[in-house]
Amino acid sequence: MRLDKFLCDALGATRKEATKILKSGEVTVNEQVQKSGAVKVTEECVVEWQGRELAMQGPRYIMLYKPEGFVCSHEDGFNHTAFVLLDEVKMDELHFAGRLDVDTTGLVLITDDGKWSHRITSPKHKCDKTYRVWLADPIGSDYAEKLAEGVQLRNEKELTLPAQMTIVNADENEVLLTIHEGKYHQVKRMFAALGNKVEQLHRERIGAIELDESLEPGEYRYLTQEEIDSVWK
């Protein structure tokens, strides 16, 4: 691929803008400054601009540790969008593969691959999602059984699919809940149906993809190939 085409793809630049960037002398290929757009680059080449390594633009698969106070949308008139936490080009092409409420923290997956995200969000695939939940009131002795049978959500005709709950810390009213669907505010509504209230909610896992323990709130990384492939299994 020509270097100017590579820059257009990697930076979302026009051909004219790519030419201007090259003339600035801020682009290196394998640590050598290159000003010609005709230079050929391959997958083995290391291309940098202003000291930042650029990648050949293919589908992107991102894991974000969403902090509280950010919404999963491109625009919101009242809250920060989680996209401001990303340092990426062509942001308008990215979307969330499953959202979290503004006050919910944890794992969010972001991509520009619609087929991949559909595999996660489509109800027919029943993608597992695991949440750490802190409740306002003590954990009922019958909660696990009722959730495993399915509960009746307000304004819903059907029971929820069977969910798995385990107690993490009874003194702190802390549980882990795994669900297999993604209804609006589902976890909060499930515990409301049991007469309790969710005080704090944190998503730890989507399918086989677990939130990286090394990430701090607001940080992100690209998924490994194994994590990407796990969605199709």
From Swiss-Prot:
Catalytic residues (UniProt): 101 (nucleophile)
Cited Pfam families: PseudoU_synth_2, S4
Enzyme class: isomerase
Keyword DNA-binding: no
Molecular-function annotations in GO: 16S rRNA pseudouridine(516) synthase activity; RNA binding
Enzyme Commission no: 5.4.99.19
Gene3D superfamilies: Alpha-L RNA-binding motif (3.30.70.1560), Pseudouridine synthase I, catalytic domain, N-terminal subdomain (3.30.70.580), RNA-binding S4 domain (3.10.290.10)
Keyword Nucleotide-binding assigned: no
Residue span(s) of domain S4 RNA-binding: 1-67
Reactions mediated catalytically: uridine(516) in 16S rRNA = pseudouridine(516) in 16S rRNA
GO biological process terms on file: enzyme-directed rRNA pseudouridine synthesis
Source organism superkingdom: Bacteria
Keywords: Isomerase, RNA-binding, rRNA processing
InterPro entries reported in the protein's UniProt record: PsdUridine_s_RsuA/RluB/E/F_cat (IPR042092), PsdUridine_synth_cat_dom_sf (IPR020103), PsdUridine_synth_RsuA/RluA (IPR006145), PsdUridine_synth_RsuA/RluB/E/F (IPR000748), PsdUridine_synth_RsuA/RluB_CS (IPR018496), RsuA_PseudoU_synthase (IPR050343), S4_RNA-bd (IPR002942), S4_RNA-bd_sf (IPR036986)
Disulfide cysteine pairs (residue numbers): none
Family: Belongs to the pseudouridine synthase RsuA family.
Role summary: Responsible for synthesis of pseudouridine from uracil-516 in 16S ribosomal RNA.
Protein name in UniProt: Ribosomal small subunit pseudouridine synthase A
Taxonomic source organism: Vibrio vulnificus (strain CMCP6)
